[in-house]
């Protein structure tokens, strides 16, 4: 049986029951398991019990506390940086984190939380991130958490906002007259990264 691992769109835990003679054993296998109360995706479905558990465990030696206020922290960073005339660059994994950042930035812009800089542009420099985002937008709404599901059902795209610019092939990159780069290709962090410029 597959259960929702809540890590990435479509991620699953696999529950297997094996019988040998009169003895039945349950084995659960999973890669990463997501956190609860994250935006966009459903929380991971708990596994009631198992005889053997095989799971990715990068953070398996600690308990996660309450989820930080990412929207508040990001708002503060954007506000302070824009007030100084700066640019915010956010290195992000192309799948999962990029969509989460888009979700947060849409919320920040929708609520007008960055004062005096309402129309700031956001550039996502990653064709892979753009493809992943389009897959998120095509998935059945039952794969989304209740808040994102309600946004989609009410006609709101939770991963798009005014001022969002996505990367284009490098031969189409050009600088605009006012000097703002249309496309940034100079930040690379880890495998399959995306970079944001706001």
What are these regions (language model features)?
Residues 77-198:
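Hard-cation-handling environments
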Residues 1-100, 106-117:
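His/Asp/Glu-rich metal-coordinating catalytic cores
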């Amino acid at each position: 049986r597959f259960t929702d691992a809540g890590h990435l769109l479509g991620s699953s835990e696999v529950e297997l029951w094996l019988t040998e003679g009169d003895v039945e054993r349950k084995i659960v296998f999973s890669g990463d398991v997501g956190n609860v109360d994250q935006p966009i995706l459903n929380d991971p479905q708990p596994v009631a019990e198992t005889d053997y558990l095989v799971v990715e465990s990068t953070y398996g030696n600690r308990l996660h506390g309450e989820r930080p206020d990412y929207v508040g922290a990001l708002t503060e960073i954007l506000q302070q940086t824009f007030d100084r005339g700066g640019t915010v660059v956010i290195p992000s994994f192309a799948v999962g984190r990029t969509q989460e950042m888009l979700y947060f930035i849409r919320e920040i812009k929708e609520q007008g939380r960055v004062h005096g800089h309402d129309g700031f542009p956001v550039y996502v420099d990653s064709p892979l991130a753009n493809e992943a985002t389009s897959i998120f937008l095509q998935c059945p709404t039952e794969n989304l958490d209740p808040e994102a599901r309600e946004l989609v059902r009410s006609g709101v795209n939770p991963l798009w906002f005014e001022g969002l610019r996505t990367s284009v092939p490098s031969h189409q990159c050009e600088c605009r007259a006012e000097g703002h780069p249309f496309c940034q290709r100079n930040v690379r962090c880890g495998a399959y990264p995306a970079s944001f410029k706001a």
